[in-house]
Amino acid sequence: MKIALIGNQNSGKTSLFNLLTGNNQKVGNWPGVTLERKTGILRTSNAEVIDLPGIYSLSPYSHEENIVRRFLLEEKVDLIINIIDSTAIERSLYLTTQLFNFNIPMVIALNMTDLAFEQGIRIDVNKLSKALSVPVVPISCLKRTGIKDLIMLITKDTPTSTNYLTIYSNPLQETINKTAELLPIDAKEFLAIKLLENDIDLAPRIDLDVSKDIKKLNDHYKLGVSEVLANERYNFIEKVRDIAVSSRE
């Protein structure tokens, strides 16, 4: 089993990688760049864990973002561990909404729950899991709590569902679905979105003309496709926050 560990910078991702793999690690470089590539073997199993560079989105604007995109498109990934900073949950969930589009099973490691509690942030893990349709495990890399629960979930009850929620309105979602059906490759939904966004890196590589669809979406929403996608992701995140997050009075 191949596991991709993905999250924002400073989310505790590398600390979690160390806790999951111990001394069973190899360090190299990603092709073409000097960024470290860390891989390890998950404790009590033979699953491979890859510590991907910290990113905030899957736009093609940095080496780190391109590495993560390319990895998810080119490698056979069985599971994503998406580590989230509990003290910045809305910012963290933006990347989560983009990871949905790869249709890869996912588990969320909700880190820094102890710090969030100290700051008066209350996160209902069950409500968060239900709102996202993703298993959520609260952890603290600093205090090393929840790590055994996370490993147990991965090894004994490995998530396999990719039945993620539809978060975009129509006609945007309908256009994404229609475009995805025309693509004879994996990660269809992610690539369909990138085509409709006219992604500077991926769109030129895909032989499919979606210019008419882009114009229809622009005319309907009175905004560019990228702006519409971002707005609807943020709207979804706000709904999730209202369901699962509260502040101590």
Describe each PLM feature range.
Residues 16-17, 35, 51, 68, ...:
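Residue-level signature of catalytic and energy-coupling elements of molecular machines
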Residues 40-43, 67-136:
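Conserved C-terminal guanine-recognition region of P-loop GTPase G domains, centered on the G4
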Residues 32, 54-55, 86-89, 112-117, ...:
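Conserved nucleotide-binding/hydrolysis micro-motifs of P-loop NTPases
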